[in-house]
């Protein structure tokens, strides 16, 4: 692939890690953010120490506070901003874009107010003549590992397979590999909903339960994620892939996962507001729990783990009692995903 110009919107941990992948591939990378000290640090010290204390970035990776400068003459735009501001940033991008670009996003969540997936938001806010079909970049990926060039395999999903193949070529190298998929609904819902299950797995750890319980919540969590996704129009096979079971494993078993760490803290009895303050990063699984619970209630989808976590976070139920309560639920077949 020839050298491409890519704007990455959101210089958080994942946006920064992906900027390095693209830079390693010889592309022109521009990070955009709205925190002056962070932007100055990236440009002058070539570090982003809030997320990576010991990593020095290549000097070719630049950052700006000026969205117009970031978008000028780019071939592709990657959204890596928190779910709750995706629509706002998309509107700002739409007001500036003056040429067609490949639009990608690598965030994992559902909009709280509308319950919409992020690709839908981008399609609504950015005129079709200025963008490709949206490409979703998702899968089992800790930024802490990608930034040190550890082997990572993820998915590029789009309704337009050619757009997905473009993104596959854009990012893939000797340590970072993408597979294509056309099931956007499946890939996005898997990426968003697995954060809920990671909170649950972390809570079990915080409560002192062992590997048996953690394996159970991850596998039964996959079942309820699949049930909801299929109801929304996804292919059930997607949940067996990188963006499904792959992402669920990496997020539901690792201390690198902010959702897992948040769940572990909840299990230890810490207050949510203290957890969010101490972590200093967005915990997407907290907001997604509420959205998924509401969707499941509207559609009549059985999601006991999501319900237990929802009641603990939003209704003040004791998290241990909520989890143990699932043990007395109605008996079911293991393979029910519909």
From Swiss-Prot:
Iron among keywords: no
Q: Which SUPFAM superfamilies match?
A: 6-phosphogluconate dehydrogenase C-terminal domain-like, NAD(P)-binding Rossmann-fold domains
Q: What is this protein called?
A: Glycerol-3-phosphate dehydrogenase [NAD(P)+]
**A single cellular component GO annotation:** cytosol
Protein function: Catalyzes the reduction of the glycolytic intermediate dihydroxyacetone phosphate (DHAP) to sn-glycerol 3-phosphate (G3P), the key precursor for phospholipid synthesis.
- Tell me one GO biological process term: glycerol-3-phosphate catabolic process
Q: What is its EC number?
A: 1.1.1.94
- Which locations, inside or outside the cell, does it occupy? Cytoplasm
Annotated binding of sn-glycerol 3-phosphate, by residue:
108, 139, 141, 194, 247, 257-259
Among InterPro entries, the record links this protein to: 6-PGluconate_DH-like_C_sf (IPR008927), 6PGD_dom2 (IPR013328), G3P_DH_NAD-dep (IPR006168), G3P_DH_NAD-dep_C (IPR006109), G3P_DH_NAD-dep_N (IPR011128), NAD(P)-bd_dom_sf (IPR036291)
Per UniProt, NADPH binds at: 13-14, 108, 143, 258, 282, 284
Q: Which domain of life is it from?
A: Bacteria
- Which EC class is the enzyme in? oxidoreductase
The family this protein is said to belong to:
Belongs to the NAD-dependent glycerol-3-phosphate dehydrogenase family.
Enzyme active site: 194 (proton acceptor)
Species the sequence originates in: Streptococcus pyogenes serotype M28 (strain MGAS6180)
Q: In which pathway does it act?
A: Membrane lipid metabolism; glycerophospholipid metabolism
Keywords linked to the UniProt accession? Cytoplasm, Lipid biosynthesis, Lipid metabolism, NAD, NADP, Nucleotide-binding, Oxidoreductase, Phospholipid biosynthesis, Phospholipid metabolism
